[in-house]
């Protein structure tokens, strides 16, 4: 009897950044479909814009990162990326990374930072999924498709919005709750909007090479 094809491990992820242009990543978090968690804060080594602090509660003071008045352990960006890579590789199986608004924001930024710091993206990460256009397609009846709105629609509690770990956990719970109401499984839903990692690495490499001084 032929062995069943191994399904990829689904990992829901999110990042927090300093601005909408995302000059610095401040937090990388992820949760697997089985509940394994990754969470790290990154030291920006510079003051953060006021609107960033207003949204995330994060601010930089005297060399340290704080959130809502409390010191947050943080590490340099390069170390954080390497730890994320090691965590992804530790599962020793194909991975699909899932983001909300990933094609326009999270996936582009995380891939760009890997390339910028000369760190090879984990080879076991095959595809990146974006749930934002998927929910727009499947839930046309709601007013918007922000994570908080989707959480409310699916009766999921989101108590710490704009924290990458809380948002990753919420995204996982939202997707799992949603597919229970539809005649499709989680893979069918996620595959509505999926791109291979190569799509992002090639695009970002082209940008980096174009912007390098001659």
What would you call each of these model-derived segments?
Residues 163-176:
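Acidic, divalent-metal-coordinating active-site segment for phosphoryl/phosphodiester hydrolysis
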Residues 2-111, 115, 140, 145, ...:
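Conserved non-catalytic scaffold segment of RNase H-like nuclease domains
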Residues 112-124:
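A short alpha->loop->secondary-structure connector
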Residues 4, 173-214:
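Acidic two-metal-ion nuclease catalytic site recognized across multiple nuclease folds
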Residues 113-116, 137, 153, 174-181:
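Active-site catalytic microenvironments for nucleophilic, acid-base chemistry
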Residues 128-142:
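Short alpha-helix plus adjacent loop in nuclease-associated cores
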Residues 13, 129, 166:
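Active-site flanking residues adjacent to catalytic metal/cofactor-binding acidic residues
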């Amino acid at each position: 009897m032929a062995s069943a094809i191994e399904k990829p491990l689904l990992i829901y992820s999110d990042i927090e950044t300093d601005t909408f242009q995302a000059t610095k990543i401040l937090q990388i978090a992820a949760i697997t479909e089985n509940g394994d968690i990754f969470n790290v804060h990154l030291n920006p080594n510079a003051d953060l814009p006021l609107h960033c602090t207003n949204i995330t509660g994060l601010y930089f003071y005297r060399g340290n990162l704080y959130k809502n008045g409390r010191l947050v352990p943080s590490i340099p960006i390069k170390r954080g990326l390497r730890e994320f890579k090691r965590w992804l590789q530790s599962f020793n199986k194909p991975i699909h990374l899932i983001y909300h608004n990933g094609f326009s924001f999270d996936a582009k930024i995380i891939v760009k930072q890997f390339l910028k710091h000369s760190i090879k993206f984990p080879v076991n990460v095959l595809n990146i999924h974006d749930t934002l256009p998927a929910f727009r397609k499947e839930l046309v009846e709601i007013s918007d498709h922000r994570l908080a709105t989707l959480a409310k629609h699916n009766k999921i509690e989101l108590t710490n919005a704009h924290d990458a770990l809380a948002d990753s956990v919420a995204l996982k719970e939202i997707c799992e709750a949603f597919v229970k109401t539809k005649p499709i499984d989680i893979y069918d839903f996620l595959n509505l909007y999926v791109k291979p990692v190569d799509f992002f690495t090639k695009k970002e490499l082209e940008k980096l090479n174009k912007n390098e001084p001659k």
